[in-house]
């Protein structure tokens, strides 16, 4: 059973987060290992496995990028373990330039202001790519969606680096 079916959700990218959380809580109550404490070992193990599956499914569907990767995995794309080389050289060059720009920001006197603007740009790029990915997933353009997810991974990593720099700048200021 796929994760969408487990939670009674349609297998699409845009899902109802409240419905996901409500169903997660219901399933957690239903399969909580404590409810099976007095049952035979086989049933206890089955409930623990089911609870673990429910947790994995919830974490996957709750996180937008993981949800997209999971949808693609249902179509045979294993993005989690791939060693796929990005062929979009323009995108790769843009990423190199962005990382160089981020590295340079740290050494500037107005780093906080520059970093805030940089972060807004990365957020806008992420929003644009996410909209593109949603359209591709809805249209079942799996190859294109997989490529867009790979690009979103780059942007996600870049955003994490922005946050790390924000923390360093804040620590230096404090």
Swiss-Prot record:
What GO molecular-function term can you cite, just one?
protein-folding chaperone binding
Q: Which InterPro entries is this protein grouped with?
A: DnaJ_domain (IPR001623), HscB (IPR004640), HscB_C_sf (IPR036386), HscB_oligo_C (IPR009073), J_dom_sf (IPR036869)
Q: Name one GO biological process term.
A: [2Fe-2S] cluster assembly
Q: Which UniProt keywords apply?
A: Chaperone
GO CC terms in record: iron-sulfur cluster transfer complex
Enumerate the Pfam families for this protein. DnaJ, HSCB_C
Q: Which cysteines are joined by disulfide bonds?
A: none
Q: In the UniProt record, does the keyword Plastid occur?
A: no
Give every J domain span.
2-74
Fetch the PANTHER family from UniProt: IRON-SULFUR CLUSTER CO-CHAPERONE PROTEIN HSCB (PTHR14021:SF15)
Q: Which family does it belong to?
A: Belongs to the HscB family.
HAMAP family referenced in this protein's UniProt entry, alphabetically? HscB (MF_00682)
* Summary of subunit composition and partner proteins: Interacts with HscA and stimulates its ATPase activity. Interacts with IscU.
* Function comment: Co-chaperone involved in the maturation of iron-sulfur cluster-containing proteins. Seems to help targeting proteins to be folded toward HscA.
The protein's name in its UniProt record: Co-chaperone protein HscB
Write down the species: Yersinia pestis
Q: What is the lineage of its organism?
A: Bacteria, Pseudomonadati, Pseudomonadota, Gammaproteobacteria, Enterobacterales
């Amino acid at each position: 059973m796929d994760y969408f079916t487990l939670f009674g959700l349609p297998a699409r990218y845009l899902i109802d987060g409240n419905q996901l959380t409500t169903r997660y809580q219901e399933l957690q109550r239903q399969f909580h290992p404590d409810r099976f404490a007095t049952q035979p070992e086989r049933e206890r193990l089955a409930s623990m496995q089911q609870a673990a599956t429910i947790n994995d499914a919830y974490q996957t569907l709750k996180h937008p990028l993981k949800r997209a990767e999971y949808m693609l995995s249902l179509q045979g794309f294993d993005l989690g373990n791939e060693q796929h080389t990005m062929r979009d050289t323009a995108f790769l060059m843009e990423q190199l330039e962005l990382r160089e720009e981020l590295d340079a920001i740290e050494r500037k006197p107005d780093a906080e202001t520059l970093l805030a603007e940089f972060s807004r740009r990365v957020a806008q790029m992420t929003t644009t790519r996410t909209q593109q990915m949603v359209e591709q997933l809805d249209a079942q353009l799996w190859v294109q969606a997989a490529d867009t997810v790979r690009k979103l991974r780059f942007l996600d990593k870049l955003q994490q680096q922005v946050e790390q720099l924000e923390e360093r700048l804040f620590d230096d200021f404090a």
